[in-house]
Amino acid sequence: MSTEEDQKLFLSIGLDEKRAKDTLKNKDLTALLKTIIEEASVSKGCDKSIGNLLYSLATCQQVNSPIRSNVSKAIGEEKIKTTIQFQAATQYLKDNKEFNQDTFNDFCGVGVVITPEQIQKAIDDLFTKKATEISEKKWHIPIGDLLNPLKESLKWADLKEVKIMLDKKLETTLGPKVVEAKEKKVAATTTAPVKKIEEQLAAITLKQDASLPTPKRLKIRECSPKFANQRVEVHAWAHHVRNQKKIVFLELRDGTGFLQCVLSGDLVHPSIIDKLLREATVKIVGTLVIPPADKKCPGGVELQADYWELLGPSNADLEGVINQESNVDHLFDQRHIMMRGTRASSIMKIRSLCLFAFRQHFFENHYMEVTPPTLVNTYCEGGSELFTVDYFGKPAYLTQSSQLYLETMLPVLGDNFTITQSYRAEKARTRRHLTEFLHLEAECPFITYEELQDRIEFLVVDVCEKLFKMDPELILSVNPDFKVPKRPFMRMNYSDAIEYCKKNGIQKKLEDGTEVDFEFGDDIPEAQERRMNDQIGEPIFLCRFPAEMKAFYMARCPEDRTLTESLDLLMPGVGEIVGGSMRISDFNELVAAYKKAGLDTDEYYWFTDQRKYGTTQHGGYGLGVERFLTWMLKEEHIRNVCVYQRTKDRITP
C-alpha cells in the first residue's frame, strides 16, 4: 500500500490530517496501526471515536500483548466505547497472557449500559448529600469534589455526558455562573446579592500575629518531631489541596519531601482560599505538631498554619493539562508537569541518589573521574549509529562511547570512570532503547577477564546496597518488591545460551514470520534474550561472544581465538544493562583489527599509541544508567526514568 493510500486509510478512521501525516513518518507505528485497523475490521472507515481508540491502542504500552487483537476487535465492534473502558482493556492486556471473553467483558464493562436517567439520579443523590457544601461554596466548589464520586458510582458511564449533565444541574441549582465576582467591579446590572458577596470577599487581608514567636525557616526534610510545638516557616508548592467546608488540608512539596498542612478560620476565607490552587507556590507559617497515632503524616508531623501567603499563582486549567485519561504521548508532551507527580518525582530523586552512589562506589575503590569530550571525529561502536554534526565545515560526531578516551587515561590515573551522555542513532522502537542516554563507563589496568566480571558484579550490588541504605522508604515506594541481588551472578557462555534457547523453545523470527532455532553466530534479539533471562530469573553474565559479533577493540579468548573475552550483564525484566570486555593490548593485533573493520589507522593514532608506549592487559565496561534504574525500580518503560527522554520519535520538550 502506498503512502497516499495509508494516509487515506488513517483519515477514514477519523484521524486529522496532521496526526495522519505524523504517523506516516514512523514506519513502525504505521505498520502497527494498519494491523490494528485490520484486526478491528474497519479498513473501510469508521467513526472518529473508534479511530481515536484504535490509535490509542497502537501507542499504548501493552500494544505488543499476544491477545491485543481481541481488544482491537472489541473497539471495532463498539463494545469498548469509553475512555474508562479502554483503560480497563489495556490493564487487562497487562495482567493477562490468555484471553477469556467472559472475564474480559466483566473487567471492561462490556454490555453495561448507563442510561441518562441513571446518571441524573446519581447526580441528584450527590447534590442531596452535599447540599450544605454546595449552598455555602456555590460556584467555588472544586469540580473534582463532585465529579470524583460520580466516577465511582457511574464507573462505565461516558464521562463527557456525566460532565454535561453535572454542569446543567449546577446551573439549575445555583443560577448562571458568576465568573468575575471577586476581581472586577460589579456591573450596574448585577443583582444586590452578588454585590453583597463581593463586599464580603474583598473584606479580609491576612496579617501575621506579631505577638507569636518568630518562625524558624525550614526545608520540608527538616520538619520532624525534633521541632514539635515550634513555630516554623515553609516555602513550597501546593501538591494537593483538599477543601472541606471550613478547613483545608494541604499537602506541600518543596523537592526535599512532603508535609501535610491544615488551614482553618480566616485562612480559608473565600476571598483568598480560591487562589490556593494545586501547584501554586506558597509561604506557610504555623506550628509543627505530632498527629495522633492513628493518623499517618509524612515525616511524622503536621503543620497547623496560622498564616499563609501566595508567592506564585497557579491556574485552574492544570486539571485539564494531564489527567488519568491522558494517553502516553500527551503525558510526555507535558513531561515538565508530569514530573511533579508523587511517583515521577520519587523516581527523579532516586536517579539523583543513584548517581551519587555510583560515584561513592568508585571513589571508595580509588577510581578517578574523567570528563571526556562528547564531540569526536572517530567512532567506537559502529558507524551506522552515529549522529553527524557540522564542525566548522568538517564532519564530527556525537560520541557513542567514551571508552577510547578512558583507555588513554590508564597510564595517567589508573582505574578511572566517567558518567557522561552518549548518543546512538537507534532506530529501534522498544521499551529499553534511547538515542541519548547517561553512560557510566570504567577502564581498569592490570586485571583479568574474571576480575573484570567480579568488579562489575561488585559495582551493581554495592550501589544497590548504598541506595537502599540512603532511603529505603523512597525505594520501596516505587518498587515494593526491590531486593539487593546476591553474588555471585550466574555465568553463561554465548554458546550455552544458544543451546538454552533451543531446549526451551525460544526461537528467532525470520522476515516471513516463521520461527526457527537459533544457530551459533546468530545475534539473540532483545525479546528472546529477555525471555531467556526472565525464565532463569536472576542476573546473568553472558560471556565469550564470537569475534564477528563484537567491536574491533575486544580481546580474543586465549583458548579459542574465534571468541572474545566479552560479556553482557542481563537483568530480569530489562535484559542487558552492562556491556564489557577485555581490550586488545597488542600493537600489531590492534592495527590488524583496524584494517579488518575498515578504519583509518591515522585517525586513531592517539589510541594506538597506548599499545606503543607501555601496553598492558586491561578491560572495561559501560553501564546504561537508565537501564539500571529501569531494572531496579521495575519500571515498564525506560522513558519513565529519564528526565526528558530522547528516542527516534521524540526530541521535545
From Swiss-Prot:
<dbReference type="InterPro" id="IPR042558">
    <property type="entry name" value="Gln-tRNA-synth_Ib_RNA-bd_N_1"/>
</dbReference>
<dbReference type="InterPro" id="IPR004522">
    <property type="entry name" value="Asn-tRNA-ligase"/>
</dbReference>
<dbReference type="InterPro" id="IPR004364">
    <property type="entry name" value="Aa-tRNA-synt_II"/>
</dbReference>
<dbReference type="Pfam" id="PF01336">
    <property type="entry name" value="tRNA_anti-codon"/>
</dbReference>
<dbReference type="GO" id="GO:0005737">
    <property type="term" value="C:cytoplasm"/>
</dbReference>
<dbReference type="InterPro" id="IPR002312">
    <property type="entry name" value="Asp/Asn-tRNA-synth_IIb"/>
</dbReference>
<dbReference type="GO" id="GO:0004816">
    <property type="term" value="F:asparagine-tRNA ligase activity"/>
</dbReference>
<dbReference type="Pfam" id="PF00152">
    <property type="entry name" value="tRNA-synt_2"/>
</dbReference>
<dbReference type="GO" id="GO:0006421">
    <property type="term" value="P:asparaginyl-tRNA aminoacylation"/>
</dbReference>
<dbReference type="InterPro" id="IPR007639">
    <property type="entry name" value="Gln-tRNA-synth_Ib_RNA-bd_N"/>
</dbReference>
<dbReference type="InterPro" id="IPR042559">
    <property type="entry name" value="Gln-tRNA-synth_Ib_RNA-bd_N_2"/>
</dbReference>
<dbReference type="GO" id="GO:0003676">
    <property type="term" value="F:nucleic acid binding"/>
</dbReference>
<dbReference type="InterPro" id="IPR045864">
    <property type="entry name" value="aa-tRNA-synth_II/BPL/LPL"/>
</dbReference>
<dbReference type="GO" id="GO:0045335">
    <property type="term" value="C:phagocytic vesicle"/>
</dbReference>
<keyword id="KW-0436">Ligase</keyword>
<keyword id="KW-0963">Cytoplasm</keyword>
<dbReference type="InterPro" id="IPR012340">
    <property type="entry name" value="NA-bd_OB-fold"/>
</dbReference>
<keyword id="KW-0547">Nucleotide-binding</keyword>
<dbReference type="InterPro" id="IPR004365">
    <property type="entry name" value="NA-bd_OB_tRNA"/>
</dbReference>
<dbReference type="InterPro" id="IPR006195">
    <property type="entry name" value="aa-tRNA-synth_II"/>
</dbReference>
<protein>
    <recommendedName>
        <fullName>Asparagine--tRNA ligase, cytoplasmic</fullName>
        <ecNumber>6.1.1.22</ecNumber>
    </recommendedName>
</protein>
<comment type="similarity">
    <text>Belongs to the class-II aminoacyl-tRNA synthetase family.</text>
</comment>
<dbReference type="GO" id="GO:0005524">
    <property type="term" value="F:ATP binding"/>
</dbReference>
<keyword id="KW-0648">Protein biosynthesis</keyword>
<keyword id="KW-0067">ATP-binding</keyword>
<dbReference type="Pfam" id="PF04558">
    <property type="entry name" value="tRNA_synt_1c_R1"/>
</dbReference>
<keyword id="KW-0030">Aminoacyl-tRNA synthetase</keyword>
